[in-house]
Amino acid sequence: MMKRYTIILAVFLLFCTVFTFQIKARPYERFADVEKPWIQKHSMDSKLVPANKGNLIQAEIVYQSVSEHSDLVISPVNEIRPANRFPSHRKSFFAENLRASPPVVPVAVDKYAVPVANPMDPENPNAWDVTLKITTKAVTVPVDVVMVIDQSSSMGGQNIARLKSAIASGQRFVKKMLPKGMATEGVRIALVSYDHEPHRLSDFTKDTAFLCQKIRALTPIWGTHTQGGLKMARNIMATSTAVDKHIILMSDGLATEQYPVKNVTTADFIGETGNANDPIDLVIQGAINFPTNYVSNNPSTPLTPNYPTHSSKVGRRNLPESKFDYSNLSARITFDGVAGALVYEPRFPHPYYYYFPCNAAINEAQFAKNSGYTIHTIGYDLGDFALANNSLKLTATDENHFFTATPANLAAAFDNIAQTINIGIQRGEVTDFVAPGFIVKNLTQSGDVTHLLNVSNGTVHYDVSTKKLTWTTGTILSSSEATITYRIYADLDYIQNNDIPVNTTSAIGPDLGGFDTNTEAKLTYTNSNGESNQQLIFPRPTVKLGYGVIKRHYVLVNKDGQPIQANGTVVSSLSEAHVLQSQDFFLPSGGGHIVPKWIKLDKTTEALQYYSVPPTNTVITTADGKRYRFVEVPGSTPNPGQIGISWKKPAGNAYFAYKLLNYWMGGTTDQQSEWDVTSNWTGAQVPLTGEDVEFATTENFGSPAVADLHVPTTNPKIIGNLINNSDKDLVVTTNSQLTINGVVEDNNPNVGTIVVKSSKDNPTGTLLFANPGYNQNVGGTVEFYNQGYDCADCGMYRRSWQYFGIPVNESGFPINDVGGNETVNQWVEPFNGDKWRPAPYAPDTKLQKFKGYQITNDVQAQPTGVYSFKGTLCVCDAFLNLTRTSGVNYSGANLIGNSYTGAIDIKQGIVFPPEVEQTVYLFNTGTRDQWRKLNGSTVSGFRAGQYLSVPKNTAGQDNLPDRIPSMHSFLVKMQNGASCTLQILYDKLLKNTTVNNGNGTQITWRSGNSGSANMPSLVMDVLGNESADRLWIFTDGGLSFGFDNGWDGRKLTEKGLSQLYAMSDIGNDKFQVAGVPELNNLLIGFDADKDGQYTLEFALSDHFAKGGVFLEDLSRGVTRRIVDGGSYSFDAKRGDSGARFRLSYDEEWVESAEVSVLVGTVGKRILITNNCEHACQANVYTTDGKLLIRLDVKPGSKSMTEPLIDGAYVVSLQSPATSSNVRKVVVN
């Protein structure tokens, strides 16, 4: 029982001893959780040639994690960790579970903005350098570090870059560990170098400059006494009272020296371990393969060494400290010339024994580890040299304290070691959101922007969309400062256009009560004890803007002052309008301002500081030669404008509006007066619809217009204002139309005016005003063409008269404009007798607007010239006094002249009073012998001679005129009362046209064009050998057979002409235009002017396509069906008058059989074969309409003409059932 207790007590004491050792050796441990990467695997048979260390070959490697003959774990060479990657530490069981954490290193953050000092930043004087600073305090436990640096000969010569990098990296490490030099708290550094012997360069110190000086003095010397360097470091560390003790060993190859082993025996050596990665196995295999490169002799004997076999043994790495002879710290078992990886010991026979300096260094490191020192090793520029790398890995405290490095990244290795020793912050991330209204200099894209900022350590990314800076700080050492500095500018336009709040509680400035430079800046970090997600908020600096700008914008507006784009599209604001000239800046006089644009602001007040700002020029000439004039429009800045700015509203904007100086100039070769030619306009563009038209003058453009401006005939124009102070005219050409929406400005009325053109064959130009009230005094010249003359071959009544009205308010008649002698008469309704009295008729002294006149000329050829009426244009509604004088002839017949420069709309433009028939009577210019067919042919279109009645409601239908052109006259009839007022509406005026079928052409032979017919209608033409007439009949159930005002037009009879008219069922009314409820029983009257044959031609609307319309000849007692385009011929004698025909309509009538009348020729005769059940009549005409023969053909019979001369003939067939009645026949 006692024995059992003794055993338990022994185990307990052993546990306590181990526990106590762990506490003493490593009282505190601080670790960073960082990913452990592995380097790329290398080829197993690659040849390794480290400089000055001999040619070593990596043998076949067999991976084995634990040596069978060693107590140390060996990792394969392909798991060597690069210097720039920092792995996780793994705490021991006791440190993990039983040790208390040390006090956390304190961390503080700060943020401040410093105005950019003079000279001012040229981009923007509202600039600040913003700095975020993270400050770590001193470590909370003392730390001592001994740096052991290899200065062997392999660091020099062709490898001098190694030494240079080591010197630079060593100094960097010193400065990182001692950032405040002598003032650094808690950290000291000692310095040892080694070659064939160790050198104590410095004991523990904080003197950064002294340590750097010693490092810079390193010089390559032969030999590599790694054990000596570690022993020297142990000796220095023995004086340390720090809690954390660290040795940093840097070597570029194999150890070649070691201390002598006292009382050496074969037990002090060890054979192969069976782990191909173990340095023991690697060195034996290398010596077997290349013995002369690996083996040197012991200096105590000159014997030539024997070379190893697989049974050979090398010096152990776990000898007790007492076995080494430290009596002379510079002592060694090798000497120059025979140093090597293995040193032959001749005192022991086969299997041969060798000292192994790398194992001696590992052994020496273990003594330091046993004392609680942490050893960091750096394999410097070793590449894949497995023997050297694995030796240094075993020298380190563990594999996580071993680093590989090259001259290029040696500094990173030292940095990683510094971070394990002297952590203030393990990992940190700062997010900083730049405030609205501020822009970071140079940051225009998202991504890594570290190179664009001033960053002490770590990396910075920027997100353009959120204006977020993310600063990944990495590890920050204790007693250090990490900073990032970036420059911000005030975004003046954003601040101007957005209500950015000010920070009234900030106490750090630089301008208290100003704008925040950021919305939030926060540090999230892992502290020195590994506690993550720690957070600190940075303060928010506030600034005020010291400088503002006033921008002057020069933008385009249209004629209405609306902002527009270059193509004329209207936009919603001046800021969207087309820019005529690049913006510039207003700079007031006085001190403190910065050329060329920065205005010094008063930071003591938020009130606006106002400046009187003019445009640079009132006329702008662009690169294409166009000129623009300054104008003031709603919303634009006047000249000058008062613009205010302040530190809160720093960007003033003046928007100066300009209109294109697009004057009419003219003069383009062969197109000098054409409106739509761009080169005729100074702005090289044709004015858009509704824009002003202004003529160039010396005053407004520097040179005047050189040609008249003609309104194009095929492109009606609408303009705004017409401004003409030149000596050129705006010409409204024949058949053209100009509408003026604005006003006419003419400060030079004697020259340069409006001219409205007329001619014989084209309608007078049309000039209309959209705002009549603003254009009551517009002057102009209107041309008038007279067709009246002395016609020598026109029959008994030779003199041709034209009825007209003057086109201005009043005027004398311009008798000198056309040759010959004019006779001008005025229609006087109250006069009893010949109502045509010489004009002007008293009390008038001049011709007056809207009065009716007639004119003829004694010349005996049709006139070609025009008269020019000059005066004030009539631009208003007309209120005309009509009279109906009792006891006179033609009582109530009032003749009115159209004095407008547009056509009067018969249906919409005349307000008929109740006393007046709603019918206008148009007189077609000509003699009393005109409007007839002479010898079967149609006379010229200008010959006319009788009135045409046009009821208001049927105007425009079936070739009835719909308008009364300018300067034409018309007659209206009062039915009752003594006087009344008739109104003509100006805003209903239409475009002038030729008289719509009112010049004689409506009485055309066999008319096939019935015009538009919105109502059921029948148009009948009567054609005689010497005269013709036309009758219009419209049906509507609401009308009567009597007079319907506005629907019926009475016939004004003329002697000596054939007359066709509808007869009223009561009274003696005769209608040229008849509106009736239906066609049934409507009587048609006919007055014959001569004995002879007459033909009726019919134009029937589609409304009567169903059923049948019939014409009964009351004189002959025959009935014929009327079809569209059909005809009926009859005989009449001079003096015949009254009812001749009766119409009827049977809606249910259906044609009983197909019409079958054949027309052919036999020799020179025309043969008619009637195969239908009705008799038919055949009329044979020449092609120019002259009736030759009339044949009656009975049912089932034939009839033939007399022989005819060769040529073409037209045969018109008439029967009650005929639907297709016109045939063309050629006799040959």
From Swiss-Prot:
Which keywords fit this entry according to its UniProt record?
Answer: Fimbrium, Signal, Virulence
Gene3D superfamilies per UniProt: von Willebrand factor, type A domain
Q: Which CDD domains match?
A: vWFA
Occurrences of domain VWFA (ranges): 144-267
Subunit comment:
Minor fimbriae are composed of a structural subunit, most often Mfa1, and the accessory subunits Mfa3, Mfa4 and Mfa5. Fimbrium assembly occurs by linear, head-to-tail oligomerization of fimbrial subunits. This is mediated via insertion of a C-terminal beta-strand from one subunit into a groove in the N-terminal domain of the following subunit.
- State the function annotated in the UniProt record: Accessory subunit of the minor fimbriae. These filamentous pili are attached to the cell surface; they mediate biofilm formation, adhesion onto host cells and onto other bacteria that are part of the oral microbiome. They play an important role in invasion of periodontal tissues and are recognized as major virulence factors. Fimbrium subunits from different strains have highly divergent sequences, and this correlates with pathogenicity.
Q: What else is known?
A: The name (minor fimbrium subunit) does not indicate the abundance of the protein, but is derived from the greater length of the major fimbriae. In strain ATCC 33277 and strain ATCC BAA-1703 / FDC 381, major fimbriae are 300 - 1600 nM in length and about 5 nm in diameter. In contrast, minor fimbriae are only about 80 - 120 nm long. This length difference is observed only in a small number of strains, including strain ATCC 33277 and strain ATCC BAA-1703 / FDC 381, and is due to a loss of function mutation in FimB, a protein that restricts fimbrial length in other strains.
Q: What is this protein identified as? A: Minor fimbrium subunit Mfa5
Q: Which organism is it from?
A: Porphyromonas gingivalis (strain ATCC 33277 / DSM 20709 / CIP 103683 / JCM 12257 / NCTC 11834 / 2561)
